[in-house]
Amino acid sequence: MSNISVIGTGSYVPNNIITNDFLSTIVDTSDEWIRTRTGILERRISKGENTIYMATESAKEAIKNANIEANDLDLIIVATLTPDNFMPSTACSVQKEIGAMNALCFDISAACSGFIYGLEIACSMLKNSFRNKALIIGAENLSKIVDWEDRNTCVLFGDGAGSAILSKTKEEGILEFHSGSNGLKGEHLTCGVLKANNTPNKNDSLEKNNFIKMNGKEIFRFAVGAMNETIYNIQEKTKWDLNEVKYIISHQANSRIIEYTAKKLNTEKDKFYMNLDKYGNTSAASIPIALDEMNKRGLLNKQDKIILVGFGGGLTFGGVAIVWSI
């Protein structure tokens, strides 16, 4: 049976930068308060770019990086909790925009774990069918579901998209997954129906349950536990020692979660790649944006062992062990 490898990455973030200082003009907060509690300095907020546009731009980059044509794609999966439409799916809209007319397309909703879930689904579908290449996208326009009057949540989130292209290969690539869900704790991170318009300057007069609501303490506890469990299980399946792993690329939610997880794992914080200071929490987009940034910066070399790990609303969690092949 063929192996599955990552052969290309791409990403897109809006040009519009919202700093902590700007947020301090619309809610009772400060740069120091946000920075020390989250590690976030700024985030990108869409100015007209919708989820389809951001997903499409990241897909174009990934296709170019993989040195393939859009028609080479057999599968497109978009992980998002902020679609522009319920139908057609974001994946079908991306298919239209990039001209990937040979691809089977669908969306999944698993919040911040969505990209990991997408990778696992794609790997299974590639291994068990005639399909050879898949495009996995995490794309979010979270600014439209943020309560810009709630300082506990509006400081956390940003917009963006990231993509990865998978292909059947002979060389070692994606090795093992560990994933799961805990719907019993779903109430700790919720969002109702989507809003049509929402800006950092004012909220439209809709019910507050249309926005992201989060029990921060419970999510912190869940995140640290889920990350530790996931990494431990991946180590068990791969027989990797953490010293062999070059990077752990986790969901970019909060620097304290990452620092605490590193401490629990008895490993250095620098093993965890972080870019949340620039982008905030972009949900399903955070891991692929980080992966693409690392790829562009030349931080990953062939045969490097890396672990991707995510957690989020649902509640959901998941991780994957990858031998880098680009």
Swiss-Prot record:
List the molecular function annotations (GO) for this entry: 3-oxoacyl-[acyl-carrier-protein] synthase activity; beta-ketoacyl-acyl-carrier-protein synthase III activity
Cite the InterPro entries for this sequence: ACP_syn_III_C (IPR013747), ACP_syn_III_N (IPR013751), FabH (IPR004655), Thiolase-like (IPR016039)
Q: Does the keyword Lipid biosynthesis apply?
A: yes
Gene3D superfamilies found in the cross-reference section: 3.40.47.10
User: Where does this one sit in the cell?
Assistant: Cytoplasm
Name the Gene Ontology biological process terms: fatty acid biosynthetic process; secondary metabolite biosynthetic process
Q: Which domain of life is it from?
A: Bacteria
Q: Name one GO cellular component term.
A: cytoplasm
Looking at its record, which EC class is this enzyme?
transferase
Q: Where is this region: ACP-binding?
A: 252-256
Q: In which pathway does it act?
A: Lipid metabolism; fatty acid biosynthesis
Question: Which keywords fit this entry according to its UniProt record?
Answer: Acyltransferase, Cytoplasm, Fatty acid biosynthesis, Fatty acid metabolism, Lipid biosynthesis, Lipid metabolism, Multifunctional enzyme, Transferase
Q: What EC identifiers does the entry list? A: 2.3.1.180
Cite the active-site annotation: C112, H251, N281
Reactions this protein catalyses: malonyl-[ACP] + acetyl-CoA + H(+) = 3-oxobutanoyl-[ACP] + CO2 + CoA
A Pfam family of the record is ACP_syn_III_C
Q: How does it assemble?
A: Homodimer.
- Give a short account of what the protein does: Catalyzes the condensation reaction of fatty acid synthesis by the addition to an acyl acceptor of two carbons from malonyl-ACP. Catalyzes the first condensation reaction which initiates fatty acid synthesis and may therefore play a role in governing the total rate of fatty acid production. Possesses both acetoacetyl-ACP synthase and acetyl transacylase activities. Its substrate specificity determines the biosynthesis of branched-chain and/or straight-chain of fatty acids.
| Comment on protein domains | The last Arg residue of the ACP-binding site is essential for the weak association between ACP/AcpP and FabH.
Regarding protein family, the annotation reads:
Belongs to the thiolase-like superfamily. FabH family.
What PANTHER family would the database entry show? 3-OXOACYL-[ACYL-CARRIER-PROTEIN] SYNTHASE 3, BETA-KETOACYL-[ACYL-CARRIER-PROTEIN] SYNTHASE III
Q: What is this protein called?
A: Beta-ketoacyl-[acyl-carrier-protein] synthase III
Query: Which organism is the protein's source?
Result: Clostridium botulinum (strain Hall / ATCC 3502 / NCTC 13319 / Type A)
Tell me the classification of the organism that encodes this protein: Bacteria, Bacillati, Bacillota, Clostridia, Eubacteriales
Q: Which gene encodes it?
A: fabH
